[in-house]
């Protein structure tokens, strides 16, 4: 959790700096719900149940199982990067890539996709709840009240609660990660199924495969067009 949430903050910082330095305004994907009860339920079900199930079968159950034959570390890195691009949003590239790598690591160590499915389900459920909470806020009204210094309603409490939840999970997760790394370093060892081939060469082979080139090109194309507000086509 710590690494995943930390990557989200880093991703936000990087692209905020890029926009400020370049004078551009990137368009993000709106993850908030419609604010209605039906919209909230639909958002939670889609994000916390359907998406994790489909994506874990596709990325960890299929893609990683094939990629790890070149070495578990190679598989973790490459499938993680692919997972980041798969989301088609600059807001989620680093966040999703790190989560994808963590999920692949769990599969590599346990031999099952169920731990990664639980991780994915948990992360998406938290995100869906945050989405529903933020979707209930009229941000135009909130911005106007903030400018006048006359803030009313529950918007401030909701925003603070969402921020504290994310920040708290990040700090707690990072502390536990450092503790685990310090006292159980051997548990982080990965299997190299092709010791005669260097790690760099494995990554190059993966990235230069025709299927990988086409997939990455398509995903990058979608991500860039979405960020520029041009739509998919």
Residue ranges of each PLM-predicted region?
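Juxtamembrane helix-loop-helix connectors linking adjacent transmembrane helices
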Residues: 1-57, 223-233
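Transmembrane helix-loop-helix hairpins at the membrane interface
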Residues: 39-224, 229
């Amino acid at each position: 959790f710590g690494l995943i949430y930390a990557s989200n903050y880093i991703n936000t910082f990087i692209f905020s700096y890029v926009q400020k330095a370049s004078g551009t305004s990137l368009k993000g994907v709106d993850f908030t719900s419609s604010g209605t009860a039906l919209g909230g339920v639909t958002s939670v079900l889609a994000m916390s149940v359907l998406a994790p199930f489909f994506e874990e079968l596709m990325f960890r159950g299929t893609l990683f199982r094939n990629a790890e034959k070149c070495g578990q570390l190679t598989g973790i890195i490459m499938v993680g990067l692919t997972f980041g691009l798969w989301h088609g949003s600059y807001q989620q590239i680093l966040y999703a890539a790190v989560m994808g790598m963590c999920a692949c690591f769990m599969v590599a160590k346990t031999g099952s996709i169920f731990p990664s499915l639980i991780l994915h389900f948990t992360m998406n459920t938290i995100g869906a709840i945050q989405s529903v909470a933020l979707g209930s806020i009229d941000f135009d009204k909130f911005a106007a009240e903030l400018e006048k210094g006359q803030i009313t309603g529950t918007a401030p409490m909701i925003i603070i609660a969402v921020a504290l939840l994310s920040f708290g999970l990040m700090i707690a997760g990072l502390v536990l990660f450092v503790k685990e790394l310090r006292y159980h370093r051997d548990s982080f060892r990965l299997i190299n199924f092709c010791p005669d081939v260097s790690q760099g060469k494995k990554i190059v082979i993966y990235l230069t495969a025709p299927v990988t080139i086409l997939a990455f090109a398509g995903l990058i194309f979608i991500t860039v067009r979405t960020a520029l507000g041009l739509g998919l086509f």
